[in-house]
Amino acid sequence: MVMKAEPIVKALESIKGKPYKILLSASGRTYKQSISRKLRAKNSVALVCGHYEGVDARIEKFVDEIISVGDFILTGGEIAAMTIVDSVTRLLPGAIDSESLKSESFSKIENYLEYPQYTRPETFRTLTVPAVLLSGNHERIDKWRKLESIKRTRKFRPDLLK
């Protein structure tokens, strides 16, 4: 089942103002954190979600961009839309402490994965929290975090280091 073009285009045209229009589709460019930052700067965004087989291909002429959230198929674009809404919302002022955003995976400063996180107890089934994190030496902790971020990125997402 393919969704008709006419009701979707009418809905897009009825939106007050000029929202940035995105069609969610497996054929779109892959969504990344850099796109979240770009969308954060937009005044408004309209997300078009297909379902089952998607939407009439003519819709592509009425949107600004086509985005895919990954190389997999969902039954509909609603979950993909929620992913985009969440990733953009958390970048809005006041949503999350701006200092916290700087050290996250895919931060604008460095494109590394975030360093490993630990909590209590210090030892769990013979696995211990790294001693440097218990040292209280913030300079050493910062160096450890940076090194671990690079290690994790190299291990899990080497494509980010290119």
Positions of the model-derived regions?
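Structured helix-beta-strand junction loops
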Residues: 18, 42-43, 62, 147, ...
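Alpha-helical scaffold segments in soluble metabolic enzymes
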Residues: 10, 14, 83, 87, ...
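Internal, active-site/partner-interface "lid" segment
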Residues: 79, 91-131
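Short, flexible loop/turn segments with low-complexity composition
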Residues: 21, 96-102, 158-160
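Structured adenosyl-cofactor binding patch, chiefly the S-adenosyl-L-methionine
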Residues: 55-101
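SAM-dependent methyltransferases
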Residues: 121-162
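S-adenosyl-L-methionine/SAH cofactor-binding core of RNA-modifying enzymes
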Residues: 1-51, 56, 93
